[in-house]
Structure formats: C-alpha cells, structure tokens
Amino acid sequence: MMNRKVEETAETLYSQYKNRSNKNRPLLIGIDGLGGAGKTSFIKELSREFKNFNCEIGMFHLDDHIVEKNKRYRTGYEEWYEYYYLQWDIEGLITNLLEPLHKQNHVILPFYNKSADLISTRQVDVLKDSIVLIEGIFLQRKEWRYYFDYVVFLNCPFEVRRDRVLHRDSYLGDYQARLKKYTERYWLGEQHYMETVQPLTAADLIITM
C-alpha cells in the first residue's frame, strides 16, 4: 500500500515539475504532517522513486535547522508556544532557505547539532533544474506557505502517531516523561496549527497514512 502511495505521489510531483511555469529555479515541494505521521520515511521512499524519472532531487529536513535550547526552553512562554513559534527561526528560514531557493543555486543554512546544542553554518548547492523536497511539521504556517509550489500533507490518525512517538523518542526520558512532554508541548502546538492554519484545507495533496 505504501509503495503505491509513494509511486502515485512521485508521478504527481513529477508532472508538476515538468509543467512548472518557472524553469529557472527548482520546484519547491513541502512534505507536511504532524509528529509521527511518517514524513521522514515517506520522503526517503519518494526520493528513491524519483530515480525512475532521472530527476535531480534536493532534500531539507526542518528538524536539522532548529535553534539552540536556550531560545526555545524556559523562555517564559507556555511550552506549546515555544514549540510552535520558537523552535525554528521563522524569519531566518525565509531569509536563508526559502527565498534563496527562488533566486540562486545555493543556500547558506544553520545546522543544529543536537548532542552539542550548537549551530554550524554550511553551504548547500542546489540545481535549478531539480525538485527540492522540504520535510517538516508546520510547513504551511502563514509565513512559509507562499514559498512552496506544492504541499503534500501526510494525514495519520492520532492514535497511530501517539504510539509511534511515545515508543520512539527515548531521548526525552522514560515513558511517563515522554507522555508529559508530548501532552504539554508537542500535541498542544499541533492542535494550534490544525485550528489556526487548517493544513488539510491548505495542502495541494492529502495522503492518508
């Protein structure tokens, strides 16, 4: 079932790529979805599928570009607010990623090192005749949506996502610590996104996972 969904999505996106109006820059595709929806696995399968089309692919994972802990924890705001509004430098990702992808053949981006809690800056080259896949949560927030040519939303039931993340994210501590973190921070941030942005309505393609 998953393979067929990936194949169909690749065909749809390749059609968007071949028929794009501006061929002087990459086609920017967002792979959106809430925590545990399967975004990372899906984008890996999708990039493999694009090899059948002999198409150049660039990939960015939003979680590679979060800010340091002191900018998103114990800030005085509620935890859900820190997650939604402070986890990423919203304007910085426009300046350093989304706008440059529309104008030039490289981006200079901050990469986050989780173990060291440090940021390092790297240049990433991008071919103008390519598809760029950007994977992450909250991609359709009002500040970013304009820059994407096409957005796919992976829609996965809460129960499935909940079980995945609570058994996956051992770095948060034991099971009760994970449940507390998701209840107070991540799921409330996701609820805010679903209610204010309505990504299911804004997406170009919805895939049920």
Tell what function each PLM region has.
Residues 42:
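Hydrophobic positions on the alpha1 helix immediately C-terminal to the Walker A/P-loop
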Residues 53-70:
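Short beta-strand-centered segment that lines the nucleotide-binding/catalytic pocket of NTP-utilizing
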